[in-house]
Design a protein with these regions (language model features):
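N-terminal secretory signal peptides
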Residues: 1-13, 24-38
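N-terminal export leaders
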Residues: 13-19
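C-terminal region of N-terminal signal peptides and the immediate post-cleavage residues
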Residues: 34-51
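Amphipathic, heptad-repeat alpha-helical segments
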Residues: 52-86, 116-187, 191
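N-terminal substrate-binding region of glycoside hydrolase catalytic domains
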Residues: 73-113, 122, 229-309, 322, ...
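Long amphipathic alpha-helical scaffold segments
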Residues: 192-245
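Active-site cleft segment of glycoside hydrolase catalytic domains centered on the general acid/base Glu
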Residues: 243, 272-276, 301-395, 404-419, ...
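Substrate-binding cleft of secreted/luminal carbohydrate-active enzymes
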Residues: 432, 436, 449-511
Length: 513
C-alpha cells in the first residue's frame, strides 16, 4: 500500500532520534603530524609536568570574558541538553578517525582538559556555537600545554582555507575577494591572541578569532559552489509518488543549468499500484532530463526484513524499476539502530543490481550516517567506514554519500574537512550529500541549531544553502543534497517553508565555469 507522508514521518521519528549516548572510553595509539599553532603556557606554570602526562588544558570564556568552569563548558557544548549533548572525541588530525572517546574532564586550572594519546597531536571535536549556529568544532591540539580552545579551532580553519580559496579565485575572483576580506579579519584576530596577557584574555580573543574564521569558512564553502563538476546533480527526495505538478516543480530546480535527480523511497515493493506510480515518476523524470535514484530500503525499516524478505524486496525493485539511473543500496550505514547484518544486506543488494543486465551499468550509491561524537567511538562516521566497509562492497560502489541532520549532529564549519577526509579515505568513489533535513517536526528535539535559533525558515535556508554548496563544490562531487522532506516542505504553509528556491539558487550559482 502506498504510504502517506504522515506515516513516513512517524516512522522517522524513532529513526532520527536514535542517539546511542555512551560513556565508555576507547583509546588507540596513533601517530600524528604536529600542526603549527601559536600557543603558549601561561600563568607561570611550566609545561614540563603537562608534557610528561600528555595533558592539554583548554580555556573558554563566557560572554563577559570570564573563564568558564567545566560545567559552563558543558552547558554551551550541549546547548543546555545536559549529558545527552556531551559529544566530544579526540580524532586523528588527518583521517578524523577516533583516538579517544569522551576525552574531556574537569580541571582545577582551566575550563577542561584532555589526555593526549602518547602526548602527541590530536583533533578535539565537539559541538560548539558561533553567531552562525552550532558546528562540529575541530580544534587541532599540537601537544601538551595550555590553550584557548576557540583559538585552536580558529587556526585549524584558517590554515586549511588557502588552497580552496586559490581554486575559487581561478573561476570566481569576486567571490574569492569577499572571502579574502573575511580571512584578513580572522588573521588580525588570531594575531591578537598571541599578544594576550593571561589565559582569560587569550580565550576571549580566541572566541573573537573563531567568530571571524567561521564566517570566512562558511563564505568559502558557499563560494566553492563554483567548483562543482559539470555532471554533479542537484537532488531532492520523493518519500511518496509525486503528482505531475510536483514533478514539474522539482525538475525545475536545476533551471536548465544543472541536472536534477530525485531519490525515490519505495514503501511496499510488492504493491503493484505503488510500483506503477513509481514507474510513471521515473518516466516523467527522464522526459524532463532528470535522473532517478532508487532507495532500496530506508534505514528505519531495514531491520524489519529477514534475509529472505530482504532478497525478495531487492529482486522486486530491480525487476520492477529497471529504468532507474542509480541505486542507493545502503541507507545511513553506521547508524547504531541498523543491526549486525546491515553491511551484508547492502552487499547483497549491490550484487543484485550489478548482476542484472538491465541495471548492471547503473550508479551504485551507499549512504553513511554522519556523526562524529554523538554516538560511540565505533559509530563515528569515518571510523566506522574505515573499519566496516568491505572491499567487495567498495569495489561495486560508485558514490559514498553522507546523511546529515544538523539539529542532531552539527556539521557547519566542519563540512569541508569532513567531506575532504571522506574523499581522501575512499579515492575510488565520488562523494555526495545524499540526505539532508532541517526543521521537521521529528527533528525539533535535537538540541542544536544552525542559521537561526528562532526562525526555522531562515535556519532551513541557511542549512540547505551552505551544505549543498559545500558538498557540490569539490572535484569528485556526485551531487547534493537529496532533501529528505522535500515534498512536505514545498507544500504551501508548511512550517519553515520551502527549500526549492534556495536549491535552485545553488544549482544556478554552481554552473560549471
Amino acid at each position: 500500500m502506498t504510504h502517506h507522508a504522515g506515516d513516513l514521518s512517524r516512522r522517522h521519528l524513532s529513526r532520527r532520534h536514535v542517539l546511542a549516548w555512551t560513556t565508555s572510553a576507547a583509546a588507540v595509539a596513533a601517530t600524528a603530524t604536529v600542526a603549527t599553532v601559536m600557543a603558549a603556557c601561561t600563568g607561570g606554570e611550566g609545561p614540563d609536568s603537562d608534557e610528561e602526562a600528555g595533558v592539554a588544558r583548554l580555556d573558554v570564556v563566557d560572554s563577559t570574558g570570564a573563564l568558564l568552569d567545566f560545567d559552563g563548558l558543558r552547558e554551551i557544548q550541549s546547548n543546555g541538553a545536559g549529558e545527552d549533548g556531551w559529544d566530544d572525541q579526540l580524532l586523528d588530525p588527518d583521517t578524523l578517525e577516533v583516538l579517544v572517546h569522551a576525552p574531556l574532564y574537569e580541571d582545577d586550572e582551566s575550563s577542561a582538559a584532555v589526555d593526549l594519546p602518547d602526548g602527541g597531536a590530536a583533533t578535539l571535536t565537539m559541538s560548539w556555537p558561533t553567531s552562525h549556529g552550532y558546528s562540529a568544532l575541530l580544534a587541532d591540539i599540537p601537544g601538551p600545554g595550555r590553550y584557548s580552545l576557540a583559538e585552536l579551532a580558529a587556526r585549524a580553519l584558517h590554515e586549511r582555507q588557502q588552497s580552496r580559496l586559490d581554486a575559487v579565485d581561478s573561476v570566481d575572483s569576486a567571490a574569492s575577494a569577499e572571502v579574502r576580506a573575511l580571512r584578513d579579519d580572522a588573521a588580525a584576530a588570531l594575531a591578537a591572541c598571541s599578544a594576550a596577557s593571561d589565559p582569560a584574555q587569550r580565550a576571549a580573543r580566541g572566541a573573537e578569532a573563531l567568530e571571524a574564521a567561521a564566517g570566512a569558512q562558511l563564505a568559502l564553502d558557499e563560494a566553492c559552489q563554483a567548483l562543482a563538476p559539470a555532471d554533479a546533480v542537484i537532488g531532492v527526495t520523493f518519500t511518496q509518488p509525486p503528482d505531475t505538478a510536483q514533478i514539474s516543480q522539482a525538475v525545475g530546480i536545476g533551471d536548465g543549468q544543472r541536472q536534477m535527480a530525485a531519490r525515490i523511497v519505495v514503501d511496499d515493493a510488492s504493491d503493484p499500484g505503488e510500483m506503477d506510480a513509481w514507474r510513471q515518476t521515473i518516466t516523467a523524470l527522464h522526459a524532463a532530463g532528470a535522473l532517478a535514484l532508487v532507495q532500496v530500503c530506508d534505514s528505519q525499516t531495514m531491520t524489519s526484513f529477514n534475509a529472505h524478505a530482504w532478497d525478495e524486496r531487492v529482486a522486486a525493485l530491480v525487476a520492477g524499476l529497471p529504468e532507474a539511473d542509480a541505486w542507493e543500496v545502503g541507507n545511513e550505514l553506521g547508524g547504531s539502530w541498523l543491526g549486525d547484518d546491515a553491511v551484508d544486506k547492502t552487499l547483497r543488494a549491490a550484487r543484485a543490481v550489478r548482476d542484472d543486465p538491465a541495471t548492471a551499468a547503473t550508479i551504485v550509491v551507499v549512504t553513511l550516517y554522519y556523526q562524529l561524537g554523538q554516538e560511540s567511538a565505533e559509530n563515528s562516521v569515518l571510523t566506522w567506514a574505515r573499519d566496516e566497509l568491505p572491499s567487495e562492497l567498495l569495489d561495486v560502489t560508485d558514490v559514498l554519500g553522507l546523511s546529515v541532520y544538523p539539529q542532531l549532529h552539527p556539521l557547519g564549519t566542519g563540512a569541508d574537512r569532513v567531506l575532504s577526509a571522506l574523499a581522501e579515505a575512499f579515492p575510488d568513489q565520488r562523494v555526495a550529500l545524499t540526505e539532508l533535513g532541517y526543521g521537521a517536526e521529528d527533528l525539533d528535539s535535537g538540541p542544536w541549531w544552525f542559521g537561526s535559533q528562532q526562525d526555522t525558515a531562515s535556519a532551513r535556508t541557511a542549512t540547505a544553502r551552505h551544505l549543498t554548496s559545500a558538498a557540490l563544490g569539490r572535484e569528485r562531487s556526485w551531487g547534493a543534497p537529496f532533501w529528505w522532506y522535500y515534498l512536505q516542505d514545498e507544500k504551501p504553509g508548511a512550517p519553515g517553508g520551502p527549500v526549492g528556491d534556495v536549491l535552485s539558487d545553488v544549482a544556478t550559482g554552481s554552473q560549471d565555469q
